[in-house]
UniProtKB/Swiss-Prot annotation:
It is a single-pass membrane protein. Residues 19-70 have a biased composition (Pro residues). GO terms for molecular function: extracellular matrix structural constituent conferring tensile strength. It comes from the Viruses. Saimiriine herpesvirus 2 transforms T-lymphocytes, including human, to continuous growth in vitro. Two viral proteins, Tip and StpC, are essential for this function. The virus induced transforming activation is used as an important tool of T-cell biology, including HIV replication. This is Saimiri transformation-associated protein. Residues 1-72 are cytoplasmic. Residues 1-72 are annotated as: Disordered. The keyword Transmembrane applies. Residues 94-102 are extracellular. The lineage of its organism: Viruses, Duplodnaviria, Heunggongvirae, Peploviricota, Herviviricetes. It comes from Saimiriine herpesvirus 2 (strain 488).
Length: 102
């Protein structure tokens, strides 16, 4: 029985090999790779528009006091008034005495 040929696995006949067959179809796409690291930070954006104007400020402190009044001017005017009044009285008396003499 040992001399019986094994029909399951036939013996390959020797001879010239034929040309290679065409390449097979491409394989299926592989699974996606892991997520890459985050990219570098982008440049800063342009400046924003100017904001609205602020509310009006509080009122300022009161100003310094004014210069002192001039009481001397009042006294001078009073004295000048009295002198002019006396001169008018003198002139009136002179006129009256001149009229009485005539």
């Amino acid at each position: 029985m040992a001399s019986e040929p094994n029909l399951r696995y036939p013996i390959e006949e020797t001879g010239d090999r034929g040309p290679p067959g065409p390449p097979g179809p491409p394989g299926p796409q592989g699974p996606p790779g892991p997520q890459g690291p985050p990219g570098p930070q982008g440049p800063p954006g342009p400046p924003g528009p100017p904001g609205p104007p602020g509310p009006p400020g509080p009122p300022g402190p009161p100003g310094p006091p004014g210069p002192p009044g001039l009481p001397g001017l009042f006294v001078t005017n009073l004295l000048l008034g009295i002198i002019v009044l006396l001169l008018l009285i003198i002139v009136a008396l002179l006129l009256v005495s001149k009229l009485v003499v005539n």
